[in-house]
Amino acid sequence: MSSVGFEPDVQQKQHGGITGGFSLKYTCEKYFKTICSIYAEVNYAQVGWKEDILDIDNKPVIITDTKQAMAYSRTINYIQVPVFAHLAWGREERGLNIFVNAGPQFGFYLSDSKDTNFDVKNMPKTDNDRVSPVVAQDTMAIKNKLDYGIALGLGAEYSIPKVGHFLAEARYYYGLGNIYGASKRDYFGKSNYGQIVLKLSYLFDITRTKNVRRK
């Protein structure tokens, strides 16, 4: 689920999309009870925004000709590369541990698409007026093709010897970059992503070092 923090504000609902790819974890050492690792991913991700087009009474704006509620969403496809410090507490080799992921994330733009029921360049006649006059985002092309920000995740890992590691995680990403220009000459002062990701992962051991302290 994702949205874009526009300034001036654009009313939105959460935009749904898929995130999936490959993960790699390198366990460095165990300090006291903390298992310290480096965790990286290469993911294909669909992010964007879904507009909540309402009138002054918080009711959907109805297109006169079709009698449909106005709808607009933009899906933007990225290759996302997060690199995390992975700190875990609990069992490393067999059983359950709880972990925290934190670190930077980079996104490389692939493409984008619109899903709408009206002509964004020629606004239709409506039965009621939309409360927000901000519509520039509907026709603007994505300017900045590199996205970057920070992510924080909380999850659990269950390990079974000779089978692998099963991970479940909830993660939040806050974009530090903007998808549109943000200078004084640009329309938007801010246009950064906020993304909530729920992930299930499976990891298997490629190589292991002998360590009698592991449990």
Question: Where do the model's predicted regions map?
Answer:
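Extracellular/periplasm-exposed beta-strand and loop segments of Gram-negative cell-envelope proteins
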Residues: 1-15, 47-78, 109-147, 178-195
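Predominantly the C-terminal beta-signal and adjacent terminal strand-loop region
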Residues: 142-143, 147, 155-215
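Short conserved catalytic/interaction loops centered on acidic-Pro-aromatic/His motifs
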Residues: 96-99, 112-117, 163-167
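Transmembrane beta-barrel architecture of outer-membrane proteins
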Residues: 15-21, 35-37, 76-82, 97-99, ...
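Start-of-domain marker
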Residues: 1-39, 45
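Hydrophobic, well-structured mid-protein blocks that either form specific transmembrane helices
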Residues: 65-109
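Short loop/turn motifs that connect adjacent beta-strands in outer-membrane beta-barrel proteins
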Residues: 29-36, 90-97, 160-165, 207-215
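Residues on the lipid-exposed face of transmembrane beta-strands in outer-membrane beta-barrel proteins
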Residues: 20-28, 44, 81-87, 102-106, ...
